[in-house]
Each structure stands twice: as C-alpha cells, then as structure tokens.
Amino acid sequence: PSVIFKGADNTPYEKIGDEVRSLADEVPFDIPDSWEWVRLGNISSYAETKQKVNATSADPSIWGLDLEDIEKGGRLLEHKTVGERKAVGDKTVFAKGDILYSKLRPYLLKILVAPDDGICTPEIVPFRVYGVIDPNYIVNYLKSPYVDNLINSITYGVKMPRVGTETMTSLLVPVPP
C-alpha cells in the first residue's frame, strides 16, 4: 500500500516502500486541508478475489442481478431471483452494502450500493470500502463527471469497452475527515 501526504511545498506526494514521488500532475483538484487523497485500492476490497458460484447450484430464491436490471445512472430496475431468471453460468457473490460497479461500458454509470445479498454477472465488481467511509459517498464519487471522463479515457475494447482493475485500484479518491 501507498501513503499519500502533503510535502513542505504543500503539494501531494506518494510513498511506496522507500520511493517517494510527486502527485502534483495526478491530483485533479484541490481539497480542504482536513481531507486526504487515497487510492481506491487502499481503502477497498476492489482488487480482492471475488467468491464465485455457478448459478445452477445457487439457492433459486436469492437475488440474481444482471446488467440490464440496472438503469444508466445506477437506478435498480428489477430485482429477480436466480429461479425467476433461470440463471446459468458462473456468477459473483455479493453482500448487502457492497458497492456494485459495472466494469463493462463504465460510461453508463451502472453503480449502486447493494440493497440485499445476491449473485451477479462477472461484469459487475462487488467491493466494500474499509473503515467508516460511506459506500454511498464512493458511489457518488465514481459517478462524478471527473471520474467518468477519466475512466472512459482509459478503457479497453472497442465494441464492449471495459475498465481494468489496475485503473480502478489506482484511482485517487478525496476522503473527508
């Protein structure tokens, strides 16, 4: 993990191991002195291996979330069970309170806090933030025009653009006190 701090010159620096480098060109905007910049990978489980389950062996009464159930902007449209959906294939397990982030076509901003436990398509990355950070704050930050523009400038794939794990874990997040 890295540590981000303000130097004597009042600009942000990042220390990784013994190496210190300036973040002056990477920090997108000023934040209040009491706030701090952190990397999403240091405050969340985004990069951790997710628990998988085959939908055919999952409890048919649990929620089975697909991308089409989430409207552009993150509003949940449908809440179908695995049985109702007749879901098949490998799915990712998530828990109530997890942030659900669609890595496929991220410009659609299909990001929300899970209202219940369930399983979802592997195109959705469930993750938790550590400590007392409100997941709704992170969801709103991820939907911000700054993050939206940044992520969409570095997606890969033409027909089905995706955002990579490294892009997300290195994302700078302003955290209030």
Each language-model region and where it sits:
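Intrinsic disorder at enzyme termini
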Residues: P1-V27, I31
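A short beta-sheet element
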Residues: G89-T92, K96-V147, N152-E166
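DNA target-recognition patches
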Residues: P12-R21, G41-S44, V53-K86
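Non-catalytic DNA-recognition/assembly elements of restriction-modification systems
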Residues: R21-Q51, P174-P177
